[in-house]
Swiss-Prot record:
Residues 554-584 have a biased composition (Acidic residues). This is Protein CREBRF homolog. GO terms for molecular function: DNA-binding transcription factor activity, RNA polymerase II-specific; protein heterodimerization activity; RNA polymerase II transcription regulatory region sequence-specific DNA binding. Residues 385-409, 587-596 have a biased composition (Polar residues). Residues 697-755 form the bZIP domain. It is found in: Nucleus; Cytoplasm; Chromosome. The lineage of its organism: Eukaryota, Metazoa, Ecdysozoa, Arthropoda, Hexapoda. Residues 51-80, 99-154, 368-422, 438-483, 538-596 are annotated as: Disordered.
Amino acid sequence: MTENQLYPMSSEFFDTGSNSSSNTLKYDLYSLGSTVVGAALPTLTINTGYGSSSSNNNNTNNNNNNSSSHSSSSNCSTSTTNTCNVMLSTTAITIPRSSNHNQIHHHPYQQSDLQTPRHHPSPLHTLPSMTHQQNQLQQQQQQQHHNQQQQLQQSHLALGELSDFGLDALDAASLSPTLLQDVSLSAVSPLSTTLYNGNTSGAGSSNGIGSGSGGYFTPDMSHSLSLNVVSEQVLLQEATTPNELLYEMTPNSNAMWSDISSAIIHTKHEPFSLDDDYIFPNDKAEIQAADLSDLNGGDFLDVIGNIEDFLPQTAVTQSVNFLLSPQAQGQDALVAPPMELLQQQQQNHQQLQVGSLPQLQTLLTLSQQQQSNSSSTSPYEIYHSTPQKPQQQQLSASFSPGSQASQSPLTPPPPPHANRPQYQMVKSRNMQELIKKGFPMSSPPERSILSQSAALSPGGSSGFGSSASGNSTTTSNQTSGSAVRKSFGYQSAVENSQLSRLSSSAPTHLGLEHIWMRREPRQHLLSTGSLAEAESFSSLSTGSVLSPDGIDFSQDDEDDNSSENSDNYDDCSSDNGLSEDEDETRTSTPNHLSSSKGKERFFWQYNVQAKGPKGKRLVFQSKLEDPHVLNEVTDPVFSPTCSVRGIKVYKHSGKARKGDGNDLTPNARKLHNIGKELDKLSRTINDMTPVSELPFNVRPKSRKEKNKLASRACRLKKKAQHEANKIKLFGLEIEHSEFNVKAVEISYNPSIFVL
């Protein structure tokens, strides 16, 4: 509502030797700065208030600080009148100016009583009164005083207690300026806070003579300077004498860190921001405790429905109660446990009896010791790979290999600057929310064996757990389908099943079908009909057609079920070049296709549409034919029964093949020679220096040569595919004729048919 104006002031402005009558403003400001604050403070902030009423009170005793209409305009009351800030320094003076020009103008230092023997300074800038906003400002000031009283009553947290936030005294002392800017300064007294308390008890004379000393306020700098309060009650009642100093300076007071500590506790009410994809990796050194093979039988799985019962109850109480409601917690509020945890503990004691399981208690004790040893000692440790990781994170990686990167929304990762045992408490809090929503926490044995054994197994990162898979029984295999389905998502509520307690960190958005799809990568069908893995590989890599073990064409029999319009096309460009492992893949057998990451593609498997279709795709006429009679071999380029989309019938896009492309006689030797040529090209391209390592003036030439070799390799591969199709066609014709002969023999003599 107000607008500040800066007036530069030179050093001669405060010259005490100059005549004070020549410059009235210099006299007033200098006397003000010297009598009230003194030379010790280089910057002075003054709150001045003006009474809007023009009537004067002639009573000798005016003790009502909340009524501005009965007080003189020279006697300012900070709790009721309009305030304005005047910043006085050695270089500049800030005088607020009201934006409302419709009010009556008067000087802020001018007194309504003409009998007051005060010095009247010349008006610098007239400031209007704001009578219509008096009530609004009064409410704001009362609210501000109320907030200050609450802050005085609340106990400040010492620096030694910042360990709850993952900070100690050394970490707090090394905070960066960016963190200091992030701290909310609402706990520190703002600029509009009353620094001088008005006193009307001794300044209520009718002629205003006594207002010379009482009109200026007593400084209140308890928040900004961290001073020792002599009498807080006297300060709140504002009944002190005009010139009495209420506070004593402490020379060793650390004002900045006290304000930061109070701001961290009392102003950061929002929860910690957690990232959904934040996962702690597991370490083998931490999970060397007793596994399932060390336990006698699987009976302990029937009663281990709640593993949080074996955690320290004191840590549960303090961490959950403080992390979830920091604004309502004091120093003594962390002692009493919440009622929800007590109710949960009673329910768990009624359901579970674990006193007769010494081995289980030993296992849980070891896990607790590991968790206590894995607590972070540095706030930067959690962002790097550390040797200690929480053991309960195995569950997120124990169901499917693709579920390591998925994080359940029910279990958030631990917040930064927080101890890792507190993450256990947040997890228990999530379990309480599930109890409120109606999810029972104790699962029957036949449905909880799989999820609990996978969660407790040391090898939680490999499928369903390496140790759990090695010690699996018939019962776990029979109930694996139902247990996986019930432990994922909210399907358990729909199908009236039990939700396992240890399955809260598993992905909840996947069904059983998606799990199996993610568990085993599906083989993609290429346009040539051969099966290959989904990995990226070179289109010029060779296969095992020339290996001494013989050729297995079993995988090429899938051509009839393949899609020629597959989107998984390989790129036959100079960037990919030829495969570096060509010599190794040539000597490998087709039986190793599933374990060599797809680099065993046969060299004749050329993708016709690697760069997209060169022309229009051909459309063949489909009709019912006799399966016992083979069609005549026709070239689709010259076939009269073949049409092209978008072009007239009997037309084709592209040119006819050169050479013996239309000769369908199988020639295995020609295919062998093409394979040799591809090997030579592969070695030549791989031996070339990479373009990025060459000088700039040689790069274009080298790139051009490499593109030529790659183009020749693509053409050879296309020819190899054509030759391979000829051989395949010849073999299919022979096999078809043999089946026809057998069918005719069976039709004449059914007794020879043997199943």
